[in-house]
Every structure is written in C-alpha cells, then in structure tokens.
Design a protein with these regions (language model features):
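Non-catalytic structural scaffold of enzyme domains
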Residues: 17-264
C-alpha cells in the first residue's frame, strides 16, 4: 500500500481567526466618591468581564479610593483647585501602578477632567461621552439631567453634552435641584435609601418629562441606588453602568492591526 499523499501548507494563508485579543488592559479607577457607587463600578465591571470571557474571569483593575469626607468638605467650600490637585495625584498614582487608562468614578469631579487628562500619559475615559453616544444611538435629542448641584448648574457637563454631541439638555428648576442635591449628599452617599426620596425624585423626573425630556440622565453615580426604570415614564440612562461597561469595552478591545503585526 502506498503512503498517503502529503500536502505542504508552506506559503499558504492560514484561516482568518478574527482579531487577535490582547491581554486585558488594566482599568484605573479613581473611586471613593462615594464608596457606595465605587462598589457598583467594581461589581459591574467584573460581572461584565465574566459574562464576556466566561468561567471565573475577572477584570484587571486598580482603584485609588479617596476619603469622601475630605472631598465633600472641599466641594462645598468651593476649593476646586485643591480638588483638582487631588484628582491629578490619584490619576498619576494609577498610571505609575500600571493602569492603561483611567476613569473618574463620579460625574461631579469631571469638572476637572481636562486637567486630570493633561496630567497623565494614558487616556481618561470621560463619563459623559459613552452616555451621550448611547442617547444618540437610541434616537433621543432632548434629555433631562439629574445630578449634584455642581453637575446640574455648571457648564462642564451640560455644556459638553450640548457642544460635543448636540443634545438639548434640560435641568430641574431651583427647588427641584435643591431636593436632588440634598438627597445625594445627605442620604445616598451614606447608603440611605428612603421611599419618600424616591417619590420626590419621581416627581422631579415627571416635571422634566412634562417639559419635553425624552429621556433622563442619572448624572450622579449614586442615583442608580435610588431610582429605576419603573420610576420614570421615559428611559433612564444610568451613567454608572454605562461608564463601567465602556471601560470593559476598552479593556477587552481587539488588538489594533499595527500592534498585532509588531507582536508577531
């Protein structure tokens, strides 16, 4: 019996196995503002990695957690220069620790996002960007914004949504802004969830919807602890979940073609 024919594969193109996956990028998290929402970031990120990779996979991440008592005091004193220095320091520490990119796990402290981004050599994933992209992908134009008074009243967040993404952003009136802000700082950051506060938020949301809001941005990472879809007649966009999932998207992104060639 003759030997079976042998076919050389030399020079042949191997089957396309799709984009080569890199080792997970290291997610750097600036947390503690408050730790209640930072815990949600950690939970969502690791759950998402496990869901995508299977088994007992989890995220490669670092967290620098600040003392929120000090942060809250400086916020209400209006000492944004010192707050900026602290956020820059946290980002630099994460970069030195091996983070590949950084998240500020809070909406309010994105007031100094540009300064933080300028202080490091790795990317800062801005919380407003994936949120706005989700809203636009869903076909909404006019949105209501809930958050701390700093987030609702200053331009750093609302202005970014309007200028960069072309959204029309509504904020509650002065009385409703005070209610939203006080519930965040007096209850949610301490892990207190009260039915009467949920009802108050429902009323604020209803007034925004009556003013034309097609969707509501939960623009404080603690608000998702209090309200859910059943509290609103229009879709809610939870910035905590959106930001955390965007971090996983980046951490698990396929290796760019140039990087793939260099690794071969």
């Amino acid at each position: 019996m003759g030997c079976p024919a042998r076919f050389s594969t030399k020079g042949e193109t191997e089957p396309d196995k799709g984009p080569k996956m890199r080792e997970q990028a290291v997610i750097g998290l600036i947390g503690g503002m408050s730790w209640e929402s930072s815990a949600e970031y950690y939970r969502i990120i690791n759950r998402e990695v496990r869901n995508r990779l299977g088994g007992v996979h989890s995220a490669r991440s670092l967290m620098w957690s600040v003392d929120f008592g000090e942060i809250e005091r400086l916020q209400h004193q209006g000492d944004w220069d010192e707050l900026t220095n602290r956020m820059k320091d946290a980002a630099i520490r994460l970069q030195r620790g091996g983070a590949d990119f950084v998240l500020l796990c809070t909406n309010t402290m994105h007031l100094m996002a540009d300064a933080v981004a300028d202080a490091i050599d790795i990317p800062l994933l801005h919380i407003a960007d994936p949120t706005a992209e989700k809203i636009k992908a869903a076909g909404f134009q006019k949105v209501g914004l809930l958050g701390t008074a700093f987030t609702m009243e200053q331009d750093f967040y609302k202005g970014r949504l309007e200028r960069v993404f072309g959204l029309d952003v509504l904020v509650p009136d002065a009385d409703d802004r005070r209610v939203v802000h006080e519930v965040i700082y007096k209850e949610l950051v301490a892990g207190e969830i009260r039915t009467e506060s949920r009802m108050a938020y429902r009323e604020v949301i209803a007034r925004l919807v009556a003013s034309g809001a097609q969707a509501i941005i939960l623009g404080c990472t603690e608000i998702m602890l209090l309200v859910s879809a059943e509290d609103s007649a229009v879709p809610l966009f939870d910035t905590t979940t959106i930001h955390a999932i965007a971090a996983v998207d980046r951490a698990l992104a396929p290796m760019p073609a140039a990087e793939m060639r260099a690794s071969q």
